[in-house]
């Protein structure tokens, strides 16, 4: 299973996987507007991969089969100040 990978110029560390290079017809317009102009990164064969960076390989394959695309976004950043406040008992929430 080949997939083309693009990175977002608007959203840091966000990647869009599509079935065919430069074919974004299955990607919803609101998502494309949020993602911005895609920048081509690479074409990869998912069948020959055991791992795929931070994305779950089976989830990517399923999304490509069902929707025709997969959006990989970075995990949410930790709020270190909030975590420190909780550890020190200073958080009133």
From Swiss-Prot:
Domain of life where this protein originates: Bacteria
YcgL domain ranges (all copies): 1-85
Entries under InterPro entries matching the protein: YcgL-like_sf, YcgL_dom
Pfam family for this entry, one: YcgL
Protein name: YcgL domain-containing protein PSHAb0508
Originating species: Pseudoalteromonas translucida (strain TAC 125)
């Amino acid at each position: 299973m080949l997939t083309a990978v693009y990175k977002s110029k608007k959203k840091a560390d966000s990647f869009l996987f599509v079935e065919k290079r430069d074919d974004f017809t299955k990607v919803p317009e609101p998502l494309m507007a949020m993602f911005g102009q895609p920048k081509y990164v690479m074409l990869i064969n998912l069948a020959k991969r055991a791992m795929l960076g931070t994305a779950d390989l089976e989830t990517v394959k399923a999304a490509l089969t069902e929707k025709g695309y997969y959006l990989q976004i970075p995990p949410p950043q930790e709020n270190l100040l909030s975590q420190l406040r909780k550890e020190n008992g200073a958080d009133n929430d």
